[in-house]
Amino acid sequence: MCRTTKAVFEKTDVTPAQVTGISFCSQMQGMVLVDEYGRALRRPMSYMDQRASAEFKACQTHGPCVSGVNIGMLLRSLRATHAASTSVKDPLWKYKWVQAHEPEIFQEAHKWLDVKESLIARATSEFVMTRDSAYSTFLYDTRPGHEGWNEGLCQMYGVETRHLAKIIECTDVAGLLTEQAARELGLCPGTRVYGGGGDATLIGVGAGCTAVGSTHIYSGTSGWVGTVMDHQAVDLSAMIAGIVGAEKGKYNYFAEMETAGKCFEWVKDHLVLDEVNIYLSKTDVAESQETVYESLYDYMSDTVAQVASGSGGVIFTPWLHGNRCPFEDPAAAGIFFNIRLETGKAQMLRAVLEGICFHQRWMLECEERKTKTAPVIRFVGGGALSKVTCQMLADITGRTVETVENTKDVGAIGAAMLAAVGSGLFPDLAQAAAHVKVNGRYTPDAALKPVYDRNYRVFRQLYASNKKNYALLNRLKEG
């Protein structure tokens, strides 16, 4: 990050003195324990970490349960937060794991931070947490008049309140850039550092989805469907919650899948590169001037475009690291279903993209139970770089899909928008969002609806049909 920031100034006429503020966007639900100087006491744990299954089970799977959580604990959490920790991957259980397995580090810890907050601490020596990050701990009370850390929930889960940071708004000034941080970043000391936000908060903002009722779909390493609401909602049957947004009074009704683009990366490594005899050694096939492919992903997209919709009946489940919505199961895994002698790699490749889109349709339909999603959806992230995928998403969901400029960087754009609002450049995020430019529009092809609807019906049955087998094969590994 420090090298990149300095490199930016080498490619522009802007000087560090002209930078009036910075903010960060990062992955959420990480766990970073730091000392009083902001130094990490151990390797941070990412949102995908599953090591705390014993802590999760010991704390809240006893007695009568709903969605795998003790009903009393579930109701207390829902009453205060309109959500509950139902996944072993949640940061609360990472915190409890360190408490149980690394007591010396736990006692030395000054604050429990998320990824973005640890960067703010390094940059400013201030220990803060924006509301969206605080909410992702499932300890933040969202009730009017009660906003803040809920001491009752902390006691219930055994969280020490001394570890919790001061809560600020995403557009607040978190602190000023220190001399050391400024030197490392190539910026000026005293530059304002704003609260910023997590990726789940800011990717929608950077996509221009700030108005109530707007919907975006993100496909990066993970994936999600988010719809802006003016009130909180929760659907435990589908594991969807209205998470705190960047603006007070707005919430992102958020349905998440653990692996989206990561599935395409997996297929690139294991089904494509070996085909051209460069297994795991290259990501670019543009060695000769004759090739028309700028990258291997372009090659893969072009290959997919030549395969008929429906992938010859092959269906892929994109659950390579478990799943969260519409079912929470860390043991769930990927399947290539209905492979026959005539099935080729190109069909399997297309099936992966279709499987990701099927799952996104599933989440979109689940959101419709509690809110009205938008008829026109903004599609962002690395997956939106492929016109083939964009059209596929439109065809499978039956919605018009729009893409925006700089789609891989919408999280950073959202962070810049927060800094712009915080500094007074814009009065609110709606004004900033008006500057987000649409660069593509895809309408669904009605002729493809029958084949996609048929495959989608089968796709939705595959988890229920294999749930017991997933548990048999994969939950043994947790022990």
Residue positions per predicted region:
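Glycine/Thr-rich phosphate-binding loops that ligate phosphate moieties of nucleotide
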Residues: 3, 16, 20-62, 104, ...
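Glycine-rich phosphate-binding/catalytic subdomain of phosphoryl-transfer
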Residues: 3-291
